[in-house]
């Protein structure tokens, strides 16, 4: 397998990874796991950060990337954070003319996926 290059600002993409992985650690199970998966698509690379944490109810998914939105404000206070992380992630990915998505199941976990253009 040869490397696949993407067109991206490495510092901003590092921030995307840090935010997504931190969320997985923050809301994951004590003995849980995090998977980072890479898929070679036609013109893009799809990258997924998946955990086996608490999951997110469907009613919250459409608002997750809003500034200051928190699924459970009381839990967020215990875990720390500002409610800006996912909004920043979305902004960075969209600044690269790409997309981010989320799917989640309660008590099973969440998967955040984003694309980057291959270069």
Residue locations for each model-derived region?
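Conserved micro-motifs of the catalytic ATP-binding
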Residues: 3-8
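A residue-level detector for a conserved hydrophobic packing site
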Residues: 13-14
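Short helix-loop "hinge" at the ATP-lid/N-box region of the Bergerat-fold HATPase_c
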Residues: 24-25
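Short beta-strand/loop element within the Bergerat-fold HATPase_c
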Residues: 31-43
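Acidic ATP/Mg2+-coordinating residue in the GHKL
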Residues: 51
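Short helix N-cap motif at coil->helix boundaries in the Bergerat
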Residues: 55-66
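Conserved glycine-rich
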Residues: 97-98
